[in-house]
Swiss-Prot record:
Any single Gene Ontology cellular-component annotation: cytoplasm
The protein, known as: D-aminoacyl-tRNA deacylase
Gene that specifies this protein: dtd
Catalytic activity: glycyl-tRNA(Ala) + H2O = tRNA(Ala) + glycine + H(+); a D-aminoacyl-tRNA + H2O = a tRNA + a D-alpha-amino acid + H(+)
UniProt EC number: 3.1.1.96
Subunit: Homodimer.
Family affiliation: Belongs to the DTD family.
Protein purpose: An aminoacyl-tRNA editing enzyme that deacylates mischarged D-aminoacyl-tRNAs. Also deacylates mischarged glycyl-tRNA(Ala), protecting cells against glycine mischarging by AlaRS. Acts via tRNA-based rather than protein-based catalysis; rejects L-amino acids rather than detecting D-amino acids in the active site. By recycling D-aminoacyl-tRNA to D-amino acids and free tRNA molecules, this enzyme counteracts the toxicity associated with the formation of D-aminoacyl-tRNA entities in vivo and helps enforce protein L-homochirality.
Keyword list, A-Z: Cytoplasm, Hydrolase, RNA-binding, tRNA-binding
Organism name: Lacticaseibacillus casei (strain BL23)
UniProt xrefs under InterPro entries: Daa-tRNA_deacyls_DTD, DTD-like_sf
Length: 148
């Protein structure tokens, strides 16, 4: 499972001109699911991201987590994180999980974050979405459960 975590001051996701998810500040998480991923990976990432200390404390050191700053997560499914660009100019996405598994683990990831007390807004799995955000820092962190 792969995740791109961007610290943001605000973010929203729209589908066909309608805003379906919005956060004030926190993380925008782009989540990709691989074919061998299980709920263990989604739980692991949710726990890591919920405890990720990249918000500034009073002396300016990255030392605070989402809960410490009242942060939220905007979670977006992103199968393109599994793009293979080694051959040709058009990426292959055969390394991504099938949609049923991807959706199930995306929902499990969001449910785990909520169970950990993190407010979560979402896009639509498989939807054609427009995501806008104001990066803070910018701070962008990459996670790949294959590397844990």
């Amino acid at each position: 499972m792969r995740a791109v975590v961007q610290r943001s001051l605000e973010a929203k996701v729209t589908i066909e001109g309608n805003t379906v998810g919005t956060i004030d500040h926190g993380f925008v998480v782009l989540l990709g699911v691989g074919p061998t991923d299980t709920e263990a990976e989604s739980d692991y990432l949710a726990e890591k991201i919920s405890k990720l200390r990249v918000f500034s404390d009073p002396v300016g050191k990255m030392n605070l987590a989402l809960a410490d700053v009242g942060g939220q997560v905007l979670s977006i499914s992103q199968f393109t994180l599994y793009a293979d660009t080694h051959r040709g100019n058009r990426p292959s996405f055969t390394g991504a999980a099938d949609p049923a598994l991807g959706d199930r683990l995306y929902q499990a990831f969001n449910a785990k974050l909520k169970a950990l007390g993190v407010p979560v807004a979402t896009g639509e799995f498989g939807g054609d979405m427009q995501v806008s955000l104001t990066n803070d820092g910018p701070v962008t962190i990459l996670f790949d459960t294959e590397a844990k």
